[in-house]
Amino acid sequence: MLGITAEDLVDIMDIRCRIEGLASYYAAKNVSPEGLARLRHILDLQEFYFEKRDAEHLREMDDQFHDVICDMSGHAVISDTLVPLHRKTRRYRKASIADTKRTAQVVREHRAIFDAIAAGDADRAAALTTEHTIHAKESMMGRLKNHG
C-alpha cells in the first residue's frame, strides 16, 4: 500500500498486537453460543478454502474471523481502532495469506484462539492472539523486505 513504510508497518503491527489480544480477551469473557457459532462457521470455511488453495476467500475469512472477535468483545472502540489498521496493512496481509505455509499456520492459530475463547479462557485467548499477530507481523515484514 502506498504510504506505508517499514517503520509504519512495525508501529501498526505492534499496536495490533495489543488491541487484537485485548479483543480476544473480552470475547472470551463475553462468550455466547451465537458468537461461537459464527466463529466456528468461519473456521470451517477457512479450512475448506485452504484445501482449495483459494487465497482470496482465505483472506476474506481471515478478515471475518477477526471482525467477529471484535464484535464478541462488546467494545466498539476496539473495532473502531482495528478496522483502519487492517485496511492499512491489507496488501501485506493478502500476500501473507497467499503463502501456503503461513496460511496453514494461520488456520491452526485461529483454531487454537477459537478453542480458548470457547473455553472462556480470556488470558489464553489474549496470549494466543498476540502470538498470532506477532507471526503475522513477522510474515509481513519478510514480504516487505523481500518484495517492497
What kind of feature is each model-predicted range?
Residues G3-E7, R108, A127:
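Charged, amphipathic alpha-helical coiled-coil/dimerization segments
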Residues M1-C17:
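HTH-adjacent hinge/linker in prokaryotic transcriptional regulators
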Residues T5-A6, Y92-S96:
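Short alpha-helical transmembrane interface motifs in multi-pass membrane proteins
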Residues Y26-E34:
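A eukaryote-biased feature capturing mid-to-C-terminal, repeat/solenoid-rich segments of large proteins
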Residues I134-L144:
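Short arginine-rich
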Residues I117-G120:
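Short acidic-aromatic low-complexity motifs
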Residues I12-R18, P33-K94, E109-F114, R124-H135:
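Conserved amphipathic alpha-helical segments that form helical-bundle/coiled-coil interaction surfaces
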